[in-house]
Amino acid sequence: MIGIKKKYTSQNTSNILSLWYPWLHRVDENNGTMIMAKGAHKKTYKYEKEIVENGLTQMKIHHSELERYEKVNCNLDICHAVFFLDKTPHRTGHNKSGIPRTSMITRFTDQIGKFDNGW
């Protein structure tokens, strides 16, 4: 698994806390839920930057750096959520269901204004 950390950071902020949750239906491994590397937030990683036109900039961490960590699927029902720091390696899985997966994300930070977030 290639670890992916989406770019939500700014030079002017030290931490971003994200709240990720399903919107219209539950999320699980079948429809591409969030996957996190348990305990991997304690280390700084080398990454490759992948700029996605009209999308988010992706920070790809090589799988060899994350293979020792347990991968946790965040299987969530409606009204359930996960909180995580921007330093946490994470990605969403592949949607095998054939039905679009919808989720919402809210970010909390100590900074005000527009971020260089890849949009």
Predicted regions and their residues:
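Short, conserved beta-strand element in jelly-roll/cupin
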Residues: 4, 9-29, 51-52, 58-59, ...
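Sterically constrained small-residue positions within well-ordered secondary structures
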Residues: 10, 65, 95-97
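Double-stranded beta-helix
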Residues: 27-89
